[in-house]
């Protein structure tokens, strides 16, 4: 059987749904959040609802979810100024922040390799302020390289889908918003 299910959400409506999701058996949440700047958030999401997302995160934390991760897509000339704010939020609120290299999913035809902020660059930016300790996750199953903060206040994950693809050992199944199952983000069917 299935022992564990995680849900990825934009969290626009999470404030009102967090407790019900937890009560239904969901234990882990991944929330997509690329910016804490209201204007940048609106530009990326085409909606002016950053506060709704932040309220949803608070509601999920207060409901008692076992794990809440923030997924931030790392785009060159956009994300550099967002990284430390997301890190500080994660450290203070108990969220794991995961930075994902900008991948060529490209429904909007905007992907260019020059726009990828690579995982090693993200780690170097963070190391300007914090000491990071790599986590040996050779026994873990998942796409992220993980790091603890040396002071013990939280951890981050770096998903290097472009610079170090993980397709050979991917173990994920995804359900699209319209209910279709996909074994790969890059598949057409």
Language-model region placement:
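Accessory C-terminal segments flanking Radical SAM cores
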Residues: 105-189
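Radical SAM/AdoMet-radical enzyme domain recognition
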Residues: 1-98
